[in-house]
């Protein structure tokens, strides 16, 4: 610390007062951290050290030694005061710092002191200029809250008395400060002129030592910007606040304008764990039950009621400005300015009620820890309710009972509750949040709180009864109790039932109550206010309305005066509930006959309230009392006002505590496993502290991304499934949060995952025992039986003992048998068959247990005694005694021992005899159950002897009995409660091997063993290793199938019982660094014992690796290589292939007699983890040359050269003999692999002469290994070298040599990788080869191989591959791998035989073939087809035959003749070009491959695919040697005159590898097609438009023509109509004249007729009518 004191560097922090170096050296804990480096960077400081009293006692409080040390460093000690090396603290934006001053700079007349008054303090009066800051309000409020929690009761009793010594306070805020004192109890810090102080605060899981200086911030008006008391020279509030602000600055503020995040001052001052609960409307009832359990409850009593009445009378007599014991209501008129006068009475008021309530049956907290104890008789309701919607209520009765697991005495956990509300910010985006904030602000004003001044309020008590006991009703005369009449209400309307609202109130305490607030009343119910809109009158009526102002006012006064009776019942008489009376009136009703008893009193209270309302704002005092004030809130209003409640748990009140802190700058998640097993419901308090930034790490700037909060999750975990468990806990925090996890009865496994960028601390408390830690710590706890399992087994075993003990007692035997049945058969089943099965399982298990525990020979009547106890005759048949329980469940009847058929008479006689004996035996058993009989005494004595043995180790035998029952897998056992714990029961076994140091980029096998599975079970293997890459493979040896993996990890899998077991293989890859020797552990986790066991005693860790390296030469069959394997003894092997191209798809196969036994595909590498090679029919030395593929050996001269090369290369090899390659991206073992297999044939002793011929074949898939131009050039050079070697060998073909050429076989035996001497090895091979060639009459043809790939020759630009075969160290010499050239050797042997029989046959055949081809191939000019060289045209078979069949002169002559002929016939290549493009090429390839005989079907398809691709991409090409190898009879002469290229489709049906070049080519083709289509479409559309325009013109012309024709027709028609009309009119006029003439004539005739008629006749007629 001395070096720190002399630091003069100004540290400018970024949103934090601290910095840190990311190195691990900056995390010392448990000791005083001293930074002695003089070159420490700015902003980088270690975490605050853990608290140590020894460090404080040895602390240097002045410059002293530090100045001398600075002299040594070359810096003069100019400053004689301490300056915090972490820099100045950062205050919220609402407080503007203008200057920093020391106490000596502002106090000239007095000497500063740390503590002035040890009994009282006032942090309110002198700090009103700070109350605009949310951070300062929280600091002041929470210091008051802690003071009230610890010292409220003691000070209340102290101020009651008139005299006495000052009390001994349990908590003093200045005791967190240390200066010039020792770390002892009750120390007093002193003023330090040097300015160095140490503060003790709780942070990140432990008490920390925080060093501060005494520089104080001031604003422009010279106001101190830190809380202070009324004594300006008292320093403890400023010093304590500086340390608290340091902690608060670490927190991340979620809202932009919030000054305080999730940091809580109470947690820093006490170390109590804050549980945060959001007040959600759906869980209000559960929150009330929780608070009712936690908080002390107010209860009515005679003494309390009398004191309350006296307090009410006193409050009326006191002045409005003075507050008494119960004077809260008149307090609103004028607040007291004298703090000393008010404080004693307020403290007395606050804490007296809990003292009186101690007489109530529910226990209350003492004066020191009031409000922190849980009630022992709390409700048993089980629910979950937390920050995320599920938080369990504290079930105290179970927690207390579960303390039997702890050694401490029974106690309850202490808790403190306070509530918070969010300030109303206008930048809130969510409109619903704004609505809630508005409602909250309105309610808070009613209770004298301001939503602007957000701060925590302490919740002190709960109340479920009236504050003042209602007066008792007068006693009724006895005669009125007889036949009471119901009160009748005369009305025609239905009566509404008034539901009485339950009384639920909470008392809160806050120093900001009524701060700068005008109390007012807001009536919420208007029962007496009548509506102006009367019934039957529309709203728009013109009738004048009657003013009801006076009446309404009168009613409101009456309303308030009447309701205040309910108010007095709902709120304390000394405190105001503004606007709440009407609500309670509705709940309690107006029908109470005794409501008017307190009417006058309440009217006076209302008048005082009204007088207060009439005062102007200027008359309100600007100061407030520094002591917390209390008020009762209705619970519903409480939920509206506040958004969160904090429950602080005292960790020391819990039986068990676990703490773990981890600090590292890492993004990794830390996992903890938790085991808990209890017979009672489990409650775990989980507290999580996260450190998300420190110093420069995570510094907040404008452009920086948001910092993620710390995260802690807890989920149920099971090793038997990959499915994530159900989430039971999720905590997001930037500081510290806690929650309670509720688990049901039983055994549980939880997985905690903690994430925090810088560090975290986890603290778990519980009343039940639990185990938490790493997997190896927790896992052994799941092997024993669970508590419920043991309890159930003991219950059954004790019931059995009770039956045996009372077997002689007639009265108790039947009850004991019923108890036994209840114990093992708790839930009756309706299924008779299942019930019978359950009883059989129980009886058989009990019989096996009793039989097993017999140390000596059992008594003769042992079986009879057991049957007498259980009364089961069919149980102990001899045929069923040794059958397993699972098999026995399915056996109901005994099968006859013979198949002999009996007659009906014999069967009837046997049944009769059996029935007689059975009846006799049953009567004996029943007689043995009758007490005082001879049989009963004998049976009882026998059972007592058995019980004596069982009772010696009762628990062990009880568990064995129940486990036997569970092994039967009977469905009835699922009804046992302990059956749920079977999911968490496990058994595990560890297997450890060691591996040696490995070089970089090396692949090796760590573990390979076969495990035998005795029974079907779910198993999960887990690997523990430090290797960077390690993959475990598990192979079923019966089916050769691999157990599935997810993300390269073996999943939990049901392993069935098989014959050959399962092989576990672990492969590893070292990566770019050296891997030191270490241990590798495999853990097998199963559901039950016995687990699979090794096939031998101990695992093997010594393996031999054979490496074969060679270059990839493309071929038509796409085969990478083929190697034959011969073994002398059956043994397993691991096969791995790696290619230089990391994205090449390859397929690795093991063929047995050309049949695929197992295959694996991979990208860049492929592995067959385990394959068991069987012994061949004969030994390797006795095999014929046709079936033996030994290592190739070169000629004498080549051997010498090869040995020299090897000697030169050996120097550059690694010391272990394994090649060290710099290639990083080849052979990564994390490549996904697919392994397929064919069911293997069972080993049968009936076929002992079977010859196993194994071939290891690897092929390239999808043409995924295209070679670049440089690689093609390199491969072509290899081919030319191979041809030259072939010709060179042809000159000495008479020499007898062995097959093949030496490959690069690097043999790595064990992990030591010791390389066998090449010279010795070759000598042995040479001698063995000489013996073989001496026995063989004809040696096979030697086909030399290109020089092998050596470590120094590994070039990533060259296409090479590596084949590794891993066998065990002691079996490596019995495992031979040779190149497979059997088919080529057979062909060459056949040709050699023909050539030996008939010399010159090969030359003749070649000439005949060329002559035949030249006869029909169409000839072209030399310009079209240039001469073809001999190497390009000579078929491979011809070259081989020429080299083997004739001598050197003959071969030269034949070669020359062939060259001449082929030059003449070279013009026929044009026909071959056409022939390549025809469909007949496929038939040719098929027929050719079928004739060759040794080519597999995959090879055919790949060759056809390659040929088609070449034809399509390259088009016509020159004649190739591959086509010349085709048989001449397949070429038809008709092809010369037929061009079939137009009928050949240019698409390929076989799959091709989608490369970038192919994608680009396809994209270009598609774009060209689209472009052409668009052009064609444009042309078509333009033509269509032109046609349409022409059609429209033609249509218009036709219409015009038809219009003209119609007009002319109309004109002609009109002319005709006019002439016709004129003629018609003439005719009509003539007809009209004619008619008129006729009419005139008729009229004249009628007139003449009338004249001629006589008149008398007319007169006669008239007379006749009169008559």
Swiss-Prot record:
Binding site for heme b: 792, 824
Parts forming coiled coils: 1588-1629
Domain of life: Eukaryota
Localisation: Cell projection, Cilium, Flagellum
GO biological process, one term: proteolysis
Keywords on record: Cell projection, Cilium, Coiled coil, Differentiation, Flagellum, Heme, Iron, Metal-binding, Spermatogenesis
Residues of the Calpain catalytic domain: 70-411
Gene Ontology molecular function, alphabetical: calcium-dependent cysteine-type endopeptidase activity; heme binding; metal ion binding; oxygen binding
Biased composition (Low complexity): 1487-1498
Function: Probable chimeric globin with a bis-histidyl six-coordinate heme-iron atom through which it could bind dioxygen, carbon monoxide and nitric oxide. Required for sperm flagellum formation and maturation of elongating spermatids, thus playing an essential role in male fertility.
Recorded family membership: In the central section; belongs to the globin family.
Disorder named in the UniProt entry: Defects in ADGB may be the cause of asthenozoospermia, a condition in which the percentage of progressively motile sperm is abnormally low.
Name of the featured protein: Androglobin
Gene of this entry: ADGB
């Amino acid at each position: 610390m001395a070096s720190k004191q002399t630091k003069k560097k100004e540290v400018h922090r970024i949103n934090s007062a601290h910095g840190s170096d990311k190195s691990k050296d900056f995390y010392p804990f448990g000791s005083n951290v001293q930074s002695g480096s003089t070159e420490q960077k700015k902003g980088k400081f270690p975490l605050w050290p853990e608290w140590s009293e020894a460090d404080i006692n040895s602390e240097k409080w002045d410059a002293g030694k530090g100045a001398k040390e600075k002299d040594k460093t070359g810096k003069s000690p100019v400053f004689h005061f301490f300056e915090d090396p972490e820099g100045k603290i950062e205050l919220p934006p609402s407080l503007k710092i203008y200057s920093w001053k020391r106490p000596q700079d502002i106090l000239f007349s007095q000497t500063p002191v740390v503590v002035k008054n040890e009994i009282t303090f006032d942090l309110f009066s002198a700090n009103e200029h700070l109350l605009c800051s949310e951070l300062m309000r929280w600091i002041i409020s929470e210091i008051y809250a802690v003071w009230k929690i610890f010292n409220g009761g003691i000070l209340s009793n102290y101020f009651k008395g008139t005299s006495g010594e000052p009390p001994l306070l349990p908590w003093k805020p200045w005791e967190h400060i240390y200066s010039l004192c020792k770390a002892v109890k009750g120390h007093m810090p002193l003023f330090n002129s040097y300015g160095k102080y140490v503060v003790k605060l709780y942070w990140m899981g432990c008490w920390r030592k925080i060093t501060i200086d005494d520089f104080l911030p001031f604003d422009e008006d010279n106001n101190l910007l830190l809380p202070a008391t009324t004594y300006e020279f008292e320093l403890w509030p400023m010093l304590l606040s500086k340390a608290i602000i340091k902690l608060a600055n670490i927190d991340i503020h979620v809202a932009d304008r919030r000054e305080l995040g999730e940091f809580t001052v109470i947690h820093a001052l006490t170390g109590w764990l804050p549980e945060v609960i959001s007040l959600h409307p759906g869980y209000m009832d559960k929150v009330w039950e929780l608070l009712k359990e936690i908080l002390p409850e107010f209860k009515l009593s005679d003494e309390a009621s009398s004191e309350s009445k006296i307090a009410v009378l006193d409050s009326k007599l006191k002045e409005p400005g003075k507050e008494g014991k119960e004077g809260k209501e008149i307090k609103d008129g004028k607040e007291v300015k004298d703090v000393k006068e008010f404080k004693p009475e307020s403290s007395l008021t606050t804490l007296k009620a809990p003292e009186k309530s101690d007489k109530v049956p529910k226990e209350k907290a003492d004066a020191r820890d009031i409000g922190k104890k849980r009630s022992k008789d709390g409700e048993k309701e089980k629910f979950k309710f937390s920050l995320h919607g599920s938080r369990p209520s504290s079930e105290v009765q179970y927690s207390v009972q579960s303390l039997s697991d702890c050694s401490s005495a029974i106690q309850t956990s202490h808790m403190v509750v306070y509530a918070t509300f969010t300030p109303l910010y206008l930048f809130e985006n969510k409109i619903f949040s704004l609505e809630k904030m508005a409602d909250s602000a309105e309610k808070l004003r009613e209770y004298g709180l301001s939503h602007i001044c957000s701060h925590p309020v302490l919740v002190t008590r709960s109340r479920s009864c009236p504050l003042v006991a209602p007066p008792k009703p007068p006693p009724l005369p006895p005669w009125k109790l007889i036949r009471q009449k119901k009160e009748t209400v005369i009305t025609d309307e239905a009566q509404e039932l008034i539901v009485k609202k339950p009384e639920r109130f909470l008392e809160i305490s806050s120093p900001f109550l009524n701060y700068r607030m005008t109390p007012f009343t807001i009536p919420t119910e208007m029962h007496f206010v009548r509506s102006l809109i009367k019934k039957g009158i529309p709203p728009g009526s013109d009738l004048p309305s009657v003013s009801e102002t006076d009446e309404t006012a009168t009613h409101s006064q009456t309303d308030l005066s009447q309701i205040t009776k309910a108010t007095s019942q709902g709120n304390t008489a000394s405190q105001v509930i503004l606007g709440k009376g009407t609500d309670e009136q509705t709940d309690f009703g107006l029908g109470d006959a005794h409501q008017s008893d307190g009417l006058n009193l309440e009217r006076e209270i209302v008048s005082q309230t009204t007088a207060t309302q009439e005062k102007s704002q200027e008359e309100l005092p600007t100061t407030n009392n520094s002591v917390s004030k209390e008020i009762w809130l209705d619970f519903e209003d409480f939920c509206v006002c506040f958004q969160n409640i904090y429950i602080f748990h005292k960790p020391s009140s819990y039986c068990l505590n676990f703490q773990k802190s981890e600090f590292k700058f890492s993004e990794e998640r830390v996992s903890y496993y938790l085991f808990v097993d209890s017979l009672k419901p489990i409650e775990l308090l989980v507290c999580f502290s996260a450190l998300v930034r420190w110093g420069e790490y995570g510094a907040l700037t404008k452009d920086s991304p948001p910092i993620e909060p710390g995260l802690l999750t807890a989920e149920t975990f099971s090793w038997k499934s990959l499915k994530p468990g159900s989430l039971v806990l999720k905590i997001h925090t930037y500081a510290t949060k806690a929650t309670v996890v509720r688990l049901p009865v039983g055994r549980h496994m939880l997985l905690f995952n903690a994430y925090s960028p810088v560090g975290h601390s986890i603290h778990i408390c519980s009343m039940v025992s639990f185990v938490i830690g790493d997997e190896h710590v927790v896992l052994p706890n799941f092997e024993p039986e669970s508590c419920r399992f043991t309890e159930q087994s003991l219950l059954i075993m004790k019931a059995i003992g009770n039956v045996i003990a009372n077997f002689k007692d007639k009265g108790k035997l039947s009850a004991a048998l019923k108890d036994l049945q209840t114990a093992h058969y708790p839930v009756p089943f309706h299924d008779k068959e299942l019930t019978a099965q359950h009883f059989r399982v129980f009886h058989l298990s009990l019989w096996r247990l009793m039989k097993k525990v017999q140390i000596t020979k059992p008594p003769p009547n042992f079986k009879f005694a057991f049957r007498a106890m259980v009364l089961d005759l069919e149980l102990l048949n001899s045929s069923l005694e040794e059958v397993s329980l699972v098999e026995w469940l399915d056996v109901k009847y005994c099968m006859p021992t013979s198949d002999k058929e009996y007659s009906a008479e014999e069967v009837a006689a046997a049944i009769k005899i059996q029935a007689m004996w059975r009846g006799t035996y049953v009567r004996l058993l029943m007689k043995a159950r009758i007490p005082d009989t001879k049989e009963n005494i004998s049976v009882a004595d026998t059972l007592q002897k058995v019980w004596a043995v069982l009772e010696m180790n009762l628990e062990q035998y009880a568990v064995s009995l129940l486990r036997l029952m569970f092994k039967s897998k009977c469905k009835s056992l699922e009804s046992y409660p302990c059956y749920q714990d079977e999911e968490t029961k496990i058994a595990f076994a560890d297997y450890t091997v060691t591996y040696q140091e490995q070089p970089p980029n090396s692949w090796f096998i760590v573990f390979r063993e076969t495990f035998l599975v005795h029974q079907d079970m779910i198993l999960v293997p887990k690997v523990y290793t430090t290797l960077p890459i390690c993959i475990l493979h598990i192979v079923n040896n019966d089916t050769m199938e691999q157990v599935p993996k997810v993300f390269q990890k073996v999943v939990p899998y049901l392993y069935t019982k098989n014959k050959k077991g399962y092989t576990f293989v672990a492969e590893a890859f070292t990566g770019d660094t050296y891997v030191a020797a270490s241990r590798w552990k495999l853990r097998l986790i199963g559901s039950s014992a016995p687990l699979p066991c090794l096939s031998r005693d101990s695992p093997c860790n010594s393996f031999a690796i054979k490496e074969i390296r060679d270059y990839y030469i493309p071929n038509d069959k796409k085969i990478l290589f083929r190697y034959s394997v011969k073994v002398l003894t059956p043994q397993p092997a691991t096969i791995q292939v790696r290619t230089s191209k990391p994205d090449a798809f390859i397929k690795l196969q093991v063929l047995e007699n050309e049949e695929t036994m197992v295959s694996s595909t991979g990208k860049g590498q492929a592995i067959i983890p385990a394959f068991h090679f069987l012994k061949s029919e004969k030994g390797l030395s006795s095999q014929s040359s046709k079936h033996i593929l030994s290592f190739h050996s070169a000629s004498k001269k080549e051997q010498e050269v090869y040995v020299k090369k090897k000697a030169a290369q050996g120097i550059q090899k690694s010391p272990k003999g394994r090649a060290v390659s710099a290639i990083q991206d080849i052979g990564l073992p994390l490549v996904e692999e697919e392994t397929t297999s064919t069911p293997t044939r069972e080993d049968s002793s009936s076929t002992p002469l079977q010859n196993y011929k194994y071939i290891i074949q690897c092929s390239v898939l999808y043409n995924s290994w295209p070679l670049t131009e440089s690689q093609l050039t390199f491969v072509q050079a290899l081919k030319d070298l191979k041809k030259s070697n072939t010709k060179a060998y042809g000159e000495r073909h008479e020499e007898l040599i062995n097959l093949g050429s030496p490959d690069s076989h690097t043999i790595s035996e064990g992990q030591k990788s010791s390389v066998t001497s090449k010279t010795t090895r070759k000598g042995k091979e040479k001698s063995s080869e000489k013996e073989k060639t001496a026995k063989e009459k004809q040696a096979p043809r030697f086909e030399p191989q290109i020089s092998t790939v050596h470590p120094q020759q590994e070039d990533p630009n060259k296409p090479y591959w590596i084949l590794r075969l891993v066998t065990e160290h002691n079996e490596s010499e019995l495992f031979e791998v040779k190149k497979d050239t059997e088919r080529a050797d057979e062909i060459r042997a056949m040709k050699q035989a023909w050539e030996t029989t008939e010399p010159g046959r090969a030359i003749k055949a070649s000439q005949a073939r060329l002559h035949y081809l030249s006869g029909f191939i169409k000839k072209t000019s030399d310009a079209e087809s240039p001469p073809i060289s001999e190497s390009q045209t000579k078929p491979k078979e011809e070259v081989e035959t020429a080299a083997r069949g004739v001598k050197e002169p003959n071969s030269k002559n034949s070669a020359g003749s062939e060259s001449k002929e082929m030059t003449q016939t070279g013009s026929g290549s044009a026909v071959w070009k056409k022939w390549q493009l025809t469909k007949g090429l496929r038939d040719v390839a098929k027929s050719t491959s079928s004739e060759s005989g040794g080519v597999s079907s995959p090879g055919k398809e790949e060759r056809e695919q390659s040929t088609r691709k070449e034809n399509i991409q390259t088009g016509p090409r020159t004649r190739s040697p591959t086509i010349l190898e085709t048989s001449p009879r397949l070429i038809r002469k008709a092809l010369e005159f037929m061009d079939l290229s137009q009928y050949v489709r240019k698409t390929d049906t076989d799959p091709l590898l989608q490369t970038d070049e192919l994608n680009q080519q396809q994209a270009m083709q598609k774009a060209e097609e689209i472009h052409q289509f668009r052009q064609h479409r444009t042309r078509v559309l333009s033509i269509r438009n032109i046609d349409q325009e022409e059609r429209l013109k033609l249509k218009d012309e036709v219409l015009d023509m038809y219009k003209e024709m119609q007009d002319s027709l109309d004109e002609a028609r009109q002319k005709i109509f006019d002439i016709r009309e004129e003629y018609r009119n003439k005719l009509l006029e003539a007809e009209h004249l004619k008619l008129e003439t006729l009419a005139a004539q008729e009229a004249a005739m009628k007139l003449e007729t009338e004249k001629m008629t006589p008149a008398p006749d007319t007169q006669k007629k008239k007379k006749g009518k009169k008559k």
